[in-house]
Curated annotation (Swiss-Prot):
The lineage of its organism: Bacteria, Bacillati, Bacillota, Bacilli, Lactobacillales. This is Dihydropteroate synthase. Pathway: Cofactor biosynthesis; tetrahydrofolate biosynthesis; 7,8-dihydrofolate from 2-amino-4-hydroxy-6-hydroxymethyl-7,8-dihydropteridine diphosphate and 4-aminobenzoate: step 1/2. SUPFAM superfamilies: Dihydropteroate synthetase-like. Homodimer or homotrimer. The gene is folP. It comes from the Bacteria. It comes from Streptococcus pyogenes serotype M1. GO terms for biological process: folic acid biosynthetic process; tetrahydrofolate biosynthetic process. One of its GO terms (molecular function) is metal ion binding.
Amino acid sequence: MKIGKFVIEGNAAIMGILNVTPDSFSDGGSYTTVQKALDHVEQMIADGAKIIDVGGESTRPGCQFVSATDEIDRVVPVIKAIKENYDILISIDTYKTETARAALEAGADILNDVWAGLYDGQMFALAAEYDAPIILMHNQDEEVYQEVTQDVCDFLGNRAQAALDAGVPKNNIWVDPGFGFAKSVQQNTELLKGLDRVCQLGYPVLFGISRKRVVDALLGGNTKAKERDGATAALSAYALGKGCQIVRVHDVKANQDIVAVLSQLM
């Protein structure tokens, strides 16, 4: 499997989540020192992660805005330390070009933009400048759709075209349907059922639903975040079967066997 110029063994891969934030919904505050972050990265790599997704600002509903300066202070030391110690691809989870540039300079390989270039109009130019793969996630302000799966597909197709127009090569573009972002539980469920349509857009698809509210709803409600890892793994299997190629998860080990087996059947 290729992500732009980068080659990953197999036809599917796990992206391990590293939140260096104090307020992420699942693990906020757990990895706010470089050493704690490195220890977690080492474990995720041992468990089978092929990409580490570093985020310095929580994107959960109601989270506090973080300036680019503060975000850079959080992510750059961690990215540098990971690159100094491990041979692993790093994605930077940010929608700010200033942070993205600093992360790329520090050694990050991939851009992961939860606003698909809408928040910062220079993100695509930056991706083109660095020949960096970019993941474009569906997002919007309100939970209003005519038909959620079609609307998501239209959005992703339009944003991918905007990236192409800005000089980003097609093989550097990935898409993410954005589970949990501006979507009700019902809308997330409908989107899950239509996931194969997203996978038919012509771009590789990242699947990120780990520990989110829709997983809790599918389990009947009232579960804690870390109690959703088994269901997350089941949904990873479902997504890979629909055609997704990367699963973004908190618990790498719970997903590794699924990815290892299904990767050989894709």
